[in-house]
Amino acid sequence: MTAITLQDITIHAVVEQQGPFFDVKEFFPTLTKEQFDENRAWLQPTFIDANGGVILCVQSFLIKTPRHNILIDSCVGNHKPRPTRPFWNMMDSDRFEKGLVAAGVTVGDIDYVMCTHLHGDHVGWNTRLENGRWVATFPKAKYVMADRELAYWTQKENDDPSGFPWITDSVLPIVDAKRAQIVKSDFVLNESIQFIPTPGHRIDHYSVLVGRPGHDASITGDMIHSPIQGKYPELGMRADYDSRQAGQTRRKVFDRFCDTSTVMCVVHFPSPSTGRVRPWGDGYKFVA
């Protein structure tokens, strides 16, 4: 994606990987054959490959303002044991760090890491392995997490310490080091960085509204994974906490930004991952 300029703010994509990680029927369990066939022509090959794999990007968005460098989500990370996800298991890649450098920053320049939610592909670079310990990757950053989301996963990890490795290696070390800033999902950092509560995919998910009216962008997190969920906003995906609520959230957000100049920066859309919301029948589409 080409950097987006919003007056004195720029947004850069920092891509870790992209590929067809899940079968479309597995990823969207309620997607009907009729719905898929009706939309196959525009979905393939950009969003779904010839074998039915949903093409997803795993990336962060870097926001550069006059005052702060802010990273939204932190991908999968290196050396993280993810045995149920072979494409993420024990990664050892310099692509993410090179992406930061290409955008003009290093890990030491990041002031905030904002975790839209605490799934493993959004928190991985929170930490890095150093002498057998998980330490903060971004040495001066505050890590911003929604309070109910953190409480939910902390309890899960307490109940089953081996069952949620991304919490063990990428979230709790940040909390234990007192680097976490725990907030409500309607948190406002300043006049140009504010959260939008977007629950459903997670119990306490947030998106990030960047910029000022008429010159703004919404960084979605996992409010949406594929543009087929624009066409069918009620279409849930396999990892939703509450698919019904997620569908209601999508409609509410798309209604808010439809036919406006707001740029949607969608974490999991294949590159370039951005578009503006426009009406499309009973749903919505994304246009450049």
Regions found by a protein language model. Give the residues of each.
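Metallo-beta-lactamase
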Residues: M1-V105, D109-D121, R128, T137-P197, H215-G221, ...
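Cap/insert and terminal regions of metallo-dependent hydrolase folds
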Residues: F87-K98, P213-A288
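Active-site glycine- and acidic-residue-rich loops that bind
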Residues: V123-W125, Q194-Y206
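Active-site metal-binding loops of divalent metal-dependent hydrolases
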Residues: E16-Q17, S74-G77, L118, R148-E149, ...
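Short beta-strand scaffold segments in enzyme catalytic cores
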Residues: Q59-I63, H205-V210
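Metal-dependent catalytic neighborhoods of phosphoester/phosphodiester hydrolases
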Residues: V123-R133, R276-V277
